[in-house]
Amino acid sequence: MANDMESIKNAGGENNPASAQPLPRLWNANYIKVWSANFMIFFSFMLVMPLLPLYLSEQYGAGKHTIGLILFGYTITALVARLFSGYVVDSFPRRTVLLLSYSLFSFFFLGYLVGGPLLLFAIVRTLHGAPFGSTTVANSTVAIDVLHPQRRAEGIGFYGLSNNLATAISPSIGLYIYEVWGNFQAIFFLSFLFSLCGVIINSTVKFRQNKVIADT
């Protein structure tokens, strides 16, 4: 009888060391860094977003249709970039792809400071969508890499909150800063600084070596 009871306990996992092991840590250092970098992407992006129509109207006298086209151009290039970003991320070292695309996304904000004719601003703004699209794909891929398989679904859920949190607070902060300073250039430069922080954060992530896809 004693042997039978012991067998039942073992079958239930009471004395099974494997069943007593805790779940792997979700908020590891790499995940926190990638999460923070993603927050910086959307924070810097949304910091200027609500002010762009006002900027284009006041600085260039642009009409509603022109403003809509310029904002639409950013979205289109971001969507097109995302179509190819997955392949690029899998075909080349992820660290290189992420840091390069993130750096381009960051430095494009400096292009807003150049001024010049409306056409030049429209070109800069439209092209800016490409590194935004590729950066979001690359950063999400790295987030998956640094998560333990047992915590991956949960981790992706929390990762998405970084987008939501940045989108919720950044526009209000941008509008408040503009009301205090009354300077569009300051907002553009702050967006550059916040996005540059994201680049620096990601540069400290320990990337897992991905198997590069070879064409056959």
Segment roles from a protein language model:
Residues 119-127:
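Paired small-residue
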Residues 75-79, 83, 167-168:
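Residue-level signature of mid-helix packing/kink "hotspots" within the transmembrane helices
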Residues 193-214:
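C-terminal membrane-cytosol helix-exit motif in multi-pass small-molecule transporters
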Residues 27-70:
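Helix-loop boundary and gating motifs at the non-cytosolic
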Residues 81-93:
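Helix-to-loop junctions at the C-terminal end of transmembrane segments
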Residues 126-162:
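Cytoplasmic helix-loop-helix junction between adjacent transmembrane helices
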Residues 96-110:
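Structural signature of the two symmetry-related core transmembrane helices
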